[in-house]
Amino acid sequence: MDMSLVFFSQLNMCESKEKTFFKLMHGSGKEETSIEAKIRAKEKRNRLSLLLQRPDFHGETQASRSALLAKETRVSPEEAVKWAESFDKLLSHRDGVDAFTRFLKTEFSEENIEFWVACEDFKKCKEPQQIILKAKAIYEKFIQNDAPKEVNIDFHTKEVIAKSIAQPTLHSFDTAQSRVYQLMEHDSYKRFLKSETYLHLIEGRPQRPTNLRRRSRSFTYNDFQDVKSDVAIWL
């Protein structure tokens, strides 16, 4: 059987090219190559599938944010209606806090309710060491400058907390908590009652994703200092 001679201008070829030429000339290993190709293709599909499932691949899209509103809830429409009676009534119900938190996440201001909840939990501490550790954690997360979830409170209140954080008490965050409470009550809470998140609950309908709104202007406590709350402030 005649075999064609093949000449190469370059004698120093990479190993992969030599292997490819060897297989082409001898015609062997075709079946094995086909199987390996299928395996490699499957592995690529699996890697791509995993990549597409990563949140950081897509970024924080509107769909992923709005999906938070579709979270299943077991609250009855009758119970949800009571949340409109007062902000205090909403916060006294776990499902109310959950629904309000999901709403605030669509406005990128969930740090307010998270701080309020953290303060409520902090006031239940019994052991001195636990008080110190939790106070420090709250301060670093919500109060200090450039905190990861810094709440919008006045400079004087921040200074008072900063000076007392070395020897905290169960009342160290009372003033800041009441400020944040009033901000939510007179701002976010009113929008929540008009939102699809809440309207779907009182109508007993499944929630659906809604268009996101950009973060609203950050109000300060001074914006509401002349407004008197009709419910008890958390002190």
Swiss-Prot record:
A Gene Ontology biological process term: negative regulation of signal transduction
Question: What is the annotated tissue distribution of the protein whose record heads this document?
Answer: Expressed in bone marrow, spleen, fetal liver and lung. At very low levels expressed in heart.
Protein location: Cytoplasm
Q: Which GO terms describe its molecular function?
A: GTPase activator activity
Q: Report which superkingdom the organism of origin falls in.
A: Eukaryota
Q: What Gene Ontology terms describe where this protein resides (cellular component)? A: cytoplasm
Q: Which UniProt keywords apply?
A: Cytoplasm, Phosphoprotein, Signal transduction inhibitor
- Domain (RGS) spans 86-202
Residues with the Phosphoserine modification: S49, S216, S218
Q: What does this protein do?
A: Inhibits signal transduction by increasing the GTPase activity of G protein alpha subunits thereby driving them into their inactive GDP-bound form. Binds to G(i) alpha-1, G(i) alpha-2, G(i) alpha-3 and G(q) alpha.
Protein name, as recorded? Regulator of G-protein signaling 18
Species for this entry: Mus musculus
